[in-house]
Curated annotation (Swiss-Prot):
The active site is at C117 (proton donor). The gene is SMM1. InterPro entries: Aldolase_TIM (IPR013785), DUS-like_FMN-bd (IPR035587), DUS_fam (IPR001269), tRNA-DUS-like (IPR052582), tRNA_hU_synthase_CS (IPR018517). This is tRNA-dihydrouridine(20) synthase [NAD(P)+]. One of its GO terms (molecular function) is tRNA dihydrouridine synthase activity. Its EC number is 1.3.1.91, 1.3.1.-. Its cofactor is FMN. Belongs to the Dus family. Dus2 subfamily.
Length: 384
């Protein structure tokens, strides 16, 4: 069974936590990686498929329209993730959480419940940080997962929360959660209304850890951890405990190499150039959706760089690859790819117009054929 104590891990992040980011983080020393939050009902709809071309396991929602492709919900690469992937589920129902977890349990290393996300898409159905206001439901979800999923499959169940309004309320909740049978507790050291630009509250991490330790539950702390060097400094000088783990979110989104055990300056240019090139390699290898690739590049590439706009104008992996070839080691542009991108848009427009004309012609042909069928043949008189 996977262990969490003292580990430095990649946070669950919607959009940013897809396969290329997770694999890049693992390649640079992340001990564990979390999947993005997947809602229970969405996962239950999925069909599991083994992608032999990519050697991945894909969870897809079949299309209701035969001409439309299926929707990829989650993709994992067992060769590198099999023992290091924690799957996060968004749920407000013990039954649905259990059903969803059973669907994916054989392809992941553990199940985590999201009880900390304050975004509307999580809380509107009682999920995410809304569960902090319904602790009875949260505890029941965890107990059911431990009983019906974790124990039978020898896989850990964990939960990620935020701080409550008071220290006393937080510690009381931690006691209840640790009594459910979970293996790990992740605490985002900010209250629900706090934003990431605000400094995390770390005054009573030691007391949270004591409760966890008494229940044989490991503790991971999330909030403003920059990289592995910073994590080790927190363990040694602030938390004074090497058994407390750390979770990196925003800094890993901007640069998934922050898990490296060494922080030596790269000889290949600015860190964002190195990260950009490597991320595109991972994205290309695993057929990442162009929208997600562009999102991650918008996080990795500085806004002041001309390449921020160049990548934003791309609409295909081929265009991303072309733009990347123009990127010098120092972050400057070898040539301006604008003309190439404009030609791509012109070709796209021409193809769209050609398809529209062809569609219109088909409609006219179908209309003529329909009118012909409607015409009645008048028989000639028989007495001529």
């Amino acid at each position: 069974m996977v262990t969490y104590a003292g580990k430095l891990v990649l946070a669950p992040m919607v959009r940013a936590g897809e396969l290329p980011t997770r694999l890049m983080a693992l390649a640079h020393g992340a001990d564990l990686v979390w999947s993005p939050e997947i809602i229970d009902k969405k996962l239950i709809q999925c069909v599991r498929k083994e992608n032999t071309a990519l050697q991945t396991v894909d969870y897809v929602v079949p299309s209701k329209v035969q001409t439309r492709p299926e929707t990829l919900v989650f993709r994992t690469y067992p060769k590198l993730e099999s023992s290091k992937l924690i799957f996060q589920i968004g749920s407000a129902s013990p039954a649905l959480a259990t059903q969803a977890a059973l669907k994916v349990i054989n392809d992941v290393s553990g199940i985590d419940i999201n009880a900390g996300c304050p975004k509307h898409f999580s809380i509107h159905s009682g999920m995410g940080s809304a569960l902090l206001r319904t602790p009875d439901t949260l505890c029941l979800i965890l107990k059911e997962l431990v009983k019906n999923v974790g124990n039978p499959h020898s896989k850990p169940i964990s939960v990620k929360i935020r701080l409550l309004d008071t220290k006393q309320d937080t510690l009381q909740l931690v006691k209840r959660l640790c009594a459910t049978g979970i293996t790990n507790l992740t605490v985002h050291c900010r209250k629900t209304e706090m934003r990431n630009r605000e400094q995390p509250i770390t005054d009573y991490i030691a007391e949270i850890y004591e409760i966890c330790q008494a229940n044989n539950v490991s503790l991971i702390v999330n909030g403003a951890i920059r990289d592995r060097s910073h994590f080790h400094d927190l363990q040694a000088n602030h938390w004074k405990n090497t058994n407390i783990g750390g979770m990196i979110a925003e800094c890993a989104e901007r640069d998934p190499t922050v898990f490296d055990h060494t922080s030596k300056p790269s000889e290949d240019g600015p860190s964002w150039v190195v990260a950009c090139r490597e991320f595109i390699q991972w994205a290309t290898k695993f057929d990442n959706h162009i929208g997600n690739t562009k999102y991650m590049l918008s996080r990795i590439v500085p806004g002041k760089s001309v390449f921020f706009q160049y990548f934003a104008r791309c609409k295909s992996p081929e265009e991303v690859s072309f733009v990347l070839k123009q990127l010098n080691d120092d972050g400057s542009a070898q040539t301006d790819p604008s003309e190439y991108l404009e030609n791509c848009r012109a070709q796209e427009k021409a193809l769209k117009n050609a398809n529209a004309i062809a569609k219109q012609k088909r409609k006219q042909t179908d209309h003529i054929g329909s009118d012909t069928k409607k015409q009645k043949v008048v028989p000639l008189p028989t007495d001529i």
